Amino acid sequence: MTVALRRSWAKDLDAATLYELLKLRVEVFVVEQACPYPELDGRDLLAETRHFWLEQPDGTVTATLRLMEEHAGGEKTFRIGRVCTQRAARGHGHTTRLLQAAIAEVGDYLCRIDAQTYLADMYARHGFVAAGAEFVEDGIPHVPMVRRTTGAAWPATSDTATETDQS
């Protein structure tokens, strides 16, 4: 069965697809991880937010992440967040496929992620390095990470812990 890689600007998402993306995120983060937090944070529909997902032929979303463009201090950077995969679909390289697509879009810009600590090694395999101390958000340990590209300056660690990936 072919799992299609999809990408969309927030403004171009149809209601049914947005529903499927949010449904998967709630299933993983709120229900599975027993983490009651406000999943709808207002960033999914921002003009510069992109969504990536893997979709079964029947339209079922298998995995998703969002890529947000940020302009802190006038510098364009990116942040990957809300990375998740259906429980039954884990271990098949879906997260790798999504990360590779998002990283390709980021190009030479600095990219941040606040990774759940137990996933830090997986993100390290994609070029991310720890950029600050571990912190706990919604009862789950996280570590701020950055992916440095050619010519990108290291960020100050004081501003890295602003958004969780909720992996």
Residue map of PLM features:
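Conserved GNAT acetyl-CoA-binding A-motif
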Residues: 104-117
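Conserved acetyl-CoA pyrophosphate-binding loop and the N-cap/start of the following alpha-helix
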Residues: 89-101
